[in-house]
Each structure stands twice: as structure tokens, then as C-alpha cells.
């Protein structure tokens, strides 16, 4: 009988511990972190492969040659973008972890009646700092989203020409890389619908794959923007709660001091009356 009671108390203790642990998880920050990681993974992975596909298309179909020496050409820029992608992936992996840790600490401070004054003050400063950083990163991701839409637009034009090539058999339409700033203005790198290179481009899998990879990368950048907005809402709410916690803690301190003073006054008067009576 006693063993059964002990087992029941142990199970109850484990259940309460699990509930307490689950209650301390910052679910809003967790959702935003998952969305951020998904968006960054899609953008970085698909963007990297799309850039590699772009190099293949430029070399095989547009006959663009990599410049010799330290010349800054489109291939050099693509290599730079790839290194930027590596940095973005690493930076936002760390930033997501930091925001999750901040969410855990802030949620813990709020759960404990607003925690102790030093913790809530620190949490308030950290939340304010992260709000500023997240707002800057949101603007940066908006710029990345706008920039990623440019290759999507370019590939959409080529893909549309390939889809309608049978309708425009007698029309010779050309796609000039100079209008997108990919090659210098003095170099003429064009592909026309009546050209053999255009037929090879449309029949290859590189165009279709690269186009859709850029679309997925654009969707990933959009998901990262949504994650940043979500983080801003979470951080703003946490900052407001922690600010309220500081005020509540100050009120409790003032109230306890007043009660202590009243208690001391009553004690002093009681002693005076007792002394006067004796």
C-alpha cells in the first residue's frame, strides 16, 4: 500500500515537473525560430545551387567567358554572393539560438512573478537590444527579397520565351544580357529564339531547375521576413511584460517597506504603553 502511494507521488511529481517545463517554453519564439531556420535554409541552399546553375547557363548557352586575373566580372560577383550565403547561414543560425535563449530567460522571469528586479532589468535591456537588431535584420531581409526577385524576373522572361517558342516560330526575339548589367555594354551577348543556342537552352534542364530554385530562394527570403516580423512582435511583448514586471516589483518593495514601517510603529507604541502601564 505504501509502495503504491510512493509510486503515485513519484508519478505526480514527474507529471508536475513536465508541465512546469512545458510551461516555461517560449512557444512564440520557438515558432519564429523554426520559420527563420526554414527560410534561411531555403534561401541559402536553393540560392547557392541557383547561382551554380546560372554559371553553367552563362558559360554553355550565352558563351560568357570568365575574366582573367583580378577582373571583376559576373562570375566573380557570383562567387562573392556564394560566400555571403555561407555567412548568412552561419550568422542567422547563431542569431536564432540567441533569440531562443532570450525567450527562455524572459519567459522564466515573467513566470516567477515577474522574477527578481535585477533579472527583469537585464531582460528589459536585452529585449530592447534585440528589438533594434531584429528590426535592422528585417529591413535587410526585405532588401534581400527585392534583390532575389531580379533573377526570378530574368529567368521568367527566358522561360516564357521557351514556353511560347512554337507560337513565335517566324519571330526572332533576342535576350540581351547587357540590359541586366550582367556583361559590359561593349560586349554583345545575346540569345535569339531562332538561334541554336536558344533551342539548347530551352531543352536543357538547367533553365527549368535554376528558375525554380530562384523561386524557392525568393520564398525562403519571404519566410525570413515573416520570421523577423514575428520576432519583433514577440520581443515587443516580452519587453512590455518585463517593463511591467519592474514596476510591479518596485510596487511590492514599496508596499513591504510601508508594512514594515507600520509594524515597527505599532510595536513601538505597544512598548510605550506597556512601559507607561508598569
Curated annotation (Swiss-Prot):
Family, similarity comment: Belongs to the myelin proteolipid protein family.
Protein name: Proteolipid protein DM beta
Subcellular location: Membrane
Organism: Squalus acanthias
Main location, first listed in the record: membrane
Transmembrane regions: 30-46, 84-100, 130-146, 213-229
Keywords from the UniProt entry: Membrane, Transmembrane, Transmembrane helix
Membrane topology: Multi-pass membrane protein
Gene Ontology cellular component annotations, sorted alphabetically: axonal growth cone; filopodium; neuronal cell body; plasma membrane
PANTHER family assigned to the protein according to its UniProt record, in alphabetical order: MYELIN PROTEOLIPID, NEURONAL MEMBRANE GLYCOPROTEIN M6-A
Record GO biological process: neuron projection development
Pfam families: Myelin_PLP (PF01275)
Domain of life, source organism: Eukaryota
Amino acid at each position: 500500500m505504501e509502495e503504491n502511494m510512493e509510486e503515485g507521488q513519484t508519478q505526480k511529481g514527474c507529471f508536475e515537473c513536465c508541465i512546469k517545463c512545458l510551461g516555461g517554453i517560449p512557444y512564440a519564439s520557438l515558432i519564429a525560430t523554426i520559420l527563420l531556420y526554414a527560410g534561411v535554409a531555403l534561401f541559402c541552399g536553393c540560392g547557392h545551387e541557383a547561382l551554380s546553375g546560372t554559371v553553367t547557363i552563362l558559360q554553355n548557352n550565352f558563351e560568357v567567358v570568365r575574366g582573367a586575373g583580378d577582373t571583376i566580372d559576373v562570375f566573380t560577383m557570383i562567387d562573392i554572393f556564394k560566400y555571403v550565403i555561407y555567412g548568412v547561414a552561419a550568422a542567422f543560425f547563431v542569431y536564432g539560438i540567441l533569440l531562443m535563449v532570450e525567450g527562455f530567460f524572459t519567459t522564466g522571469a515573467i513566470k516567477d512573478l515577474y522574477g527578481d528586479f535585477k533579472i527583469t532589468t537585464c531582460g528589459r535591456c536585452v529585449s530592447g537590444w534585440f528589438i533594434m537588431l531584429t528590426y535592422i535584420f528585417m529591413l535587410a531581409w526585405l532588401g534581400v527579397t527585392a534583390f532575389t526577385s531580379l533573377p526570378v524576373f530574368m529567368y521568367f522572361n527566358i522561360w516564357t520565351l521557351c514556353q511560347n517558342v512554337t507560337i513565335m516560330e517566324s519571330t526572332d526575339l533576342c535576350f540581351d544580357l547587357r540590359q541586366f548589367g550582367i556583361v559590359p555594354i561593349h560586349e554583345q551577348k545575346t540569345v535569339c529564339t531562332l538561334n541554336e543556342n536558344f533551342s539548347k537552352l530551352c531543352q536543357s534542364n538547367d533553365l527549368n531547375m535554376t528558375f525554380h530554385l530562384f523561386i524557392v530562394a525568393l520564398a525562403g527570403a519571404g519566410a525570413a521576413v515573416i520570421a523577423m516580423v514575428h520576432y519583433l512582435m514577440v520581443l515587443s511583448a516580452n519587453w512590455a511584460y518585463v517593463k511591467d514586471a519592474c514596476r510591479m516589483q518596485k510596487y511590492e518593495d514599496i508596499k513591504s517597506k510601508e508594512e514594515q514601517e507600520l509594524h515597527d510603529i505599532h510595536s513601538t507604541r505597544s512598548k510605550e504603553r506597556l512601559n507607561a502601564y508598569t
